[in-house]
Amino acid sequence: MLYPIGIQDFESIRRNGYVYVDKTALIYRLATTGRYYFLSRPRRFGKSLLVSMMEAYFSGKKDLFEGLAVSGMEKDWTVYPVLRFDLSGEDYSRPDVLDAVLSRCLKKWEDLYGVPERSSTLSSRFKDVIEAAVAKTGRPAVVLIDEYDKPIVDTLWDENLSETVRVQLQGFYGVMKAMDGSIRFGFLTGVSKLGKLSVFSGLNNLKDISMDARYSDICGISEKELRKNFADSVKELAHANGLTEKECFAKLTEMYDGYHFCEKSEGVYNPFSLLNTLDSLHFRKYWVSTGTPSFLVKSLIQGNYRLAEMESLQVPESVLSGVYSRKPDVISLLYQTGYLTIVGYNPATERYTLGYPNKEVEDGFTDTLSEYFTPVRDNWSELSADKFVEDIRRGDVQMLMRRFTAFFADMDYRIQGKAELYFQNTMYVMLKLLGQQVAVERHTSNGRIDILVQTDRYVYIIELKRDRDPQDALDQIDEKGYDWPFLAGDRKVFKIGASFSSATRRLENWSVAE
């Protein structure tokens, strides 16, 4: 089987025999029930292939759709002039790049449709191209814009350039509304909606299908599609890894499934990781390894977020919809870029629960955070990690705390922010890296445990204090009864009070009680 890894051209996939998961029935529904749409999905989720397929459909290339669902639905196969803008391939952090990209696209169509004289502005040129396309073909135009937000994301940390880009795109996209009578269909995709309100203020007739249950699997691969299209591939993967087919499906689900884009939808697989796994016959972090955007980590750290909350975060729909015009909200960005997904919904409060979609994302994001929260010398990873794990498994709490002390003393302090949160986040990331069952701010009937680590033999209750005696932390554990839920079991409970210095950002002292 040929897997279209990195291939985003629909015609190439169909003509060269690559496997294609049929999404054409959904495109027919869009084309026959509305005119202007917006879709947000994470990177490498098949958005560009979707747009390419739309381009082929509206170009009337009937032969490419033979055997697909739409071949039995579409009767006319009308050829429309298609104007497709792909904004994904450039770095817009430099001035004038956006001008050059848009101008290059427009010039192609100006030559094709014979625009007699070029206007001075990009917006005017776009308008002239639409008019010329309609005049020459006698049919309304189709406008497809792939990765509308790439110029915005690339300039987030340059306020002046970001504002210039926003104003420019606002005027450019607004042409679609002004030329409504000359447009048959419009479709825009992107990773995020961080500029949706301000950039699209001139184009307020877009229907956002990002959280529409009818289109929840328009990108990505569902469980049903996996079993229908890749049954033999999964058998081969199972054999190569010494697994039964049932075990192999379960591991694929654990690693790459779990994306939900509305409150009532089946999970979908990350197509990039899934196809790479089936092709290479190895389970790896393919999607995460392509790079976590640095602006996400910067936003998370600067926002003083408690990292453990990323595993189960309660938010209103406005966060998922990205109703933030200029200043991006980091939780909204983490959801829209695929690092968090919907894992629950409470209709009474109308709040969504967000969490990591799968093991690949959770482990990979922890690895990325470790570069910021554990930036110590190489001897940490090479010499000490296994020893931390052994200390935890053996219940050697004194040695464990000595290692923590040495760890913080050896750190390169690049992280700023609230001291208590800094220590808590750092210990959380460390313990997650070590593969431990760790909870932060674990709720009890009388309060919240700062850090809770559990193994099959031991329970570690860690209370952190800044610039105070560690005995104060132990007293709080006793007064609040943090150990009560574990006293009836067979596991040994360690109560640890740890004191950090806000001046040196080191673990200064600790006390242990059993």
Labelled PLM ranges:
Residues 485, 489-514:
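Domain-level recognition of nuclease-like catalytic cores that cleave nucleotide substrates
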Residues 427, 449-466, 480:
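Conserved catalytic cores of phosphodiester-cleaving nucleases, focusing on short active-site segments
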Residues 133-137, 430-456:
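Active-site metal-binding core of divalent-cation-utilizing nuclease and nuclease-like domains
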Residues 1-419, 434:
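Phosphate-binding site recognition
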Residues 142, 458-460, 494:
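Structural motif
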